[in-house]
Amino acid sequence: MQIQKLNSSKLFYNKWPYKIECYILGASRLKWLGAEITKDFCLGKPTPTLWSWQSNDRLSLRDKSALLEFTTGIEPFLELKEQLQVRVEGRRYNIYCKDRTLLENIYNAVSPWVQQVSGPTTEEELSYMLDNGHKKILRDILPKDIYQYRIYFKESWKIEDRIKFLAWAIKNPNIVDISKGSKEWLEGGKRWVYNPFIYVKDAHTLTMVGLHSSGNVKRVEEFILRENLVTA
């Protein structure tokens, strides 16, 4: 299996710089029932039954053998709860961590099932990401080659005030960029949108948005070019 290595731009879940994405049938069983019960299941021993959305009991003997091997490989790391986090999405078993040595050890233990590894490629990028959390995002190029900031708005923003803000933003198309979904929410066409956002050109525009949004800015992210990392 070909492994895709990606250069991440920010911390995962505002905490973890590294991510290992694995694909394994039975991932949900391992997540919800733990390593010991999963190994018993793979060996044909009686085990608790999960809801259908949590697991698939119809694994072939080959699938069970693979799950047993994967579980045995990842089990020693599951005790390191302060050093890593596991999230399961269907058959994708994702592991997040901070330490590159730990990343490499996990990779070596479960490499046959690894599809993708993401993280900073240099110590400078790692240090920068840990120091700045989710506030600054590393990029090779700016969004649409121009926008330096992404602004998220509070979902509780009143419709009448959103409409006023949108009217201002439409008059400034060269410094503000709004996605279709966020625009529909701003104009009242959608009652609720998760994390509505816009892109803005520069710090001056950021200030203007703050003035026109009536205190409804939830979060601001700044894009930093990797080539400028030393001076950022």
Language-model-detected regions and their locations in the chain:
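Structured alpha/beta or helical-core interaction and ligand-binding surfaces enriched in interleaved
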Residues: 1-191, 221-232
